[in-house]
C-alpha cells in the first residue's frame, strides 16, 4: 500500500473547540530585561483579574491571583514569544496553575496573530478534567479601556 492509499483509507479526524473560560488579566508595566541571544527580553507582572467559565462550564469561575508574570522574548524576526505562569483561584477555593505559551505575530498582517498552548495543573476532582485536555488559547489586548489582556481557553476535541 502506498502512502496515498494509506492516507485515503484512514480519514482525518476533525478538531473542534469549546470555550472553557475567558479571563480578564490585569498587567503591570513591561520591564526591559535586556538583550539575549534569543532576542530582547521583557517581563510583565500579572496583577490579578477574573475568569468566567464558557457556556458549558458555568461553574468554572473565580479570580486570577496577583504574583504571576509573563516573560517575553522579542525575536529578531519581530515575532514575540510569551511564557506566562500564574494561578487562578476558583470560587470553590481550588487553586489552578496556568502556564500559557503564546506566539504573537503582527508582521505585515491585517490582524495580529496571538495564539497559545495552555497547560493547566488542577488538583481538585471538580476541575481535574482540565489536566487531561489540550487547551488552545487566544490573547487580545483590553487597552486602552483597561491595562489588561483577555485570555480565552478553548478545549480541543477530536471527532
What are these regions (language model features)?
Residues 2-159:
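Beta-strand-enriched cores of mature, soluble protein domains
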Amino acid at each position: 500500500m502506498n502512502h496515498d492509499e494509506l492516507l485515503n483509507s484512514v480519514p482525518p479526524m476533525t478538531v473542534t473547540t469549546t470555550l472553557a473560560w475567558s479571563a480578564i488579566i490585569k498587567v503591570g508595566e513591561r520591564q526591559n530585561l535586556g538583550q539575549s541571544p534569543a532576542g530582547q527580553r521583557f517581563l510583565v507582572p500579572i496583577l490579578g483579574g477574573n475568569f468566567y467559565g464558557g457556556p458549558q462550564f458555568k461553574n468554572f469561575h473565580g479570580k486570577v491571583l496577583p504574583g504571576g508574570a509573563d516573560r517575553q522574548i522579542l525575536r529578531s524576526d519581530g515575532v514575540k514569544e510569551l511564557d506566562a505562569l500564574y494561578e487562578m483561584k476558583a470560587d470553590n477555593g481550588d487553586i489552578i496553575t496556568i502556564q500559557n505559551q503564546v506566539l504573537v505575530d503582527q508582521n505585515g498582517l491585517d490582524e495580529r496573530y496571538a495564539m497559545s498552548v495552555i497547560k493547566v495543573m488542577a488538583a481538585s476532582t471538580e476541575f481535574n478534567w482540565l489536566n487531561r485536555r489540550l487547551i488552545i488559547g487566544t490573547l487580545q489586548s483590553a487597552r486602552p479601556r483597561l491595562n489588561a489582556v483577555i485570555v480565552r481557553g478553548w478545549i480541543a476535541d477530536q471527532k
